[in-house]
């Protein structure tokens, strides 16, 4: 499946920043918004309720990683917020991921669709050197990512967060329907920031990404609405 809207990462420190940003867009335009840790820890569920009240889709990016029971109960709560997608760290293991899905299913109100559940493989800020030196995972970065993707599929999750560079091999190792959501997307000429493994929207589409996440190239642009539409157009070519 492919989401035709780029997911906008609203990595803002304050709830007011979210309101200011979304007010720039025509109310009829429904966006896909990623809300991360800093914002959720600052504003709590109210920021989710606000974004959903405007008709936008929400990916709540909290990257849960804890013992299975804690993750299960946490997912039960998150499901009640009405979000469209949530995630965990694949490093938590199959048992934890199974528990996460079970919690989501239990918490989803009757008549609503369960939020999509995906897992983080290796962060796009992680290089092979970092992985081997800091995590002591002595395989290649690609092998680690594919292993995590296979474990995620085994647990029955919907997909993974991964670099666009790994999409083709992940789908070959799992299935074409397995979701690959790719951050680290930058238009041609944009700064890479703290991302180590990046691609353009067009490259990500060509290689088979299902969702792309774009933050600063939109949120820090002089004209965020125009920047969003340009990236959306490139993504849908």
Swiss-Prot record:
Catalytic activity: orotidine 5'-phosphate + H(+) = UMP + CO2
Protein's pathway: Pyrimidine metabolism; UMP biosynthesis via de novo pathway; UMP from orotate: step 2/2
Binding site for substrate: 11, 34, 61-70, 124, 186, 195, 215-216
GO molecular function: orotidine-5'-phosphate decarboxylase activity
Catalytic activity, EC: 4.1.1.23
Stored InterPro entries: Aldolase_TIM, OMPdecase, OMPdecase_AS, OMPdecase_bac, OMPdeCOase_dom, RibuloseP-bd_barrel
Keywords: Decarboxylase, Lyase, Pyrimidine biosynthesis
Entries under PROSITE patterns matching the protein: OMPDECASE
GO biological process assignments: 'de novo' pyrimidine nucleobase biosynthetic process; 'de novo' UMP biosynthetic process
Catalytic residue positions: 63 (proton donor)
Keyword Lyase attributed: yes
GO cellular component labels: cytosol
Family assignment from sequence similarity: Belongs to the OMP decarboxylase family. Type 1 subfamily.
Function: Catalyzes the decarboxylation of orotidine 5'-monophosphate (OMP) to uridine 5'-monophosphate (UMP).
PANTHER family listed in its UniProt record: OROTIDINE 5'-PHOSPHATE DECARBOXYLASE (PTHR32119:SF2)
Subunit structure: Homodimer.
Record's protein name: Orotidine 5'-phosphate decarboxylase
């Amino acid at each position: 499946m492919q989401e035709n809207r780029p997911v906008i990462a609203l990595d803002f420190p304050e709830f007011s920043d979210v309101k200011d940003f979304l007010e720039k867009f025509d109310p009829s335009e429904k966006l896909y918004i990623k809300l991360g840790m800093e914002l959720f820890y600052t504003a709590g569920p109210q920021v989710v309720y606000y974004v959903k009240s405007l008709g936008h889709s929400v990916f709540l990016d909290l990257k849960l990683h804890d013992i299975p029971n804690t993750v299960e109960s946490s997912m039960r709560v998150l499901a009640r917020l009405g979000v469209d997608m949530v995630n965990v760290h694949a490093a938590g293991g199959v048992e934890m991921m199974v528990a996460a899905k079970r919690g989501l299913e239990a918490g989803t109100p009757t008549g609503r669709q369960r939020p999509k559940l995906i897992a983080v493989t290796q962060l796009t800020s992680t290089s092979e050197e970092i992985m081997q030196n800091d995590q002591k995972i002595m395989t290649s970065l690609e092998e680690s990512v594919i292993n995590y993707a296979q474990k995620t599929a085994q647990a029955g999750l919907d997909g993974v967060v991964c670099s666009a560079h790994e999409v083709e091999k992940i789908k070959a190792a799992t299935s074409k329907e397995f979701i690959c959501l790719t951050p680290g997307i930058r238009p041609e000429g944009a700064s890479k920031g703290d991302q180590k493994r990046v691609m353009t929207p067009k490259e990500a589409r060509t290689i088979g990404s299902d969702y792309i996440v774009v933050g600063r190239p939109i949120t820090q642009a002089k004209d965020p609405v125009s920047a969003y539409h340009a990236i959306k157009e490139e993504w849908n070519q």
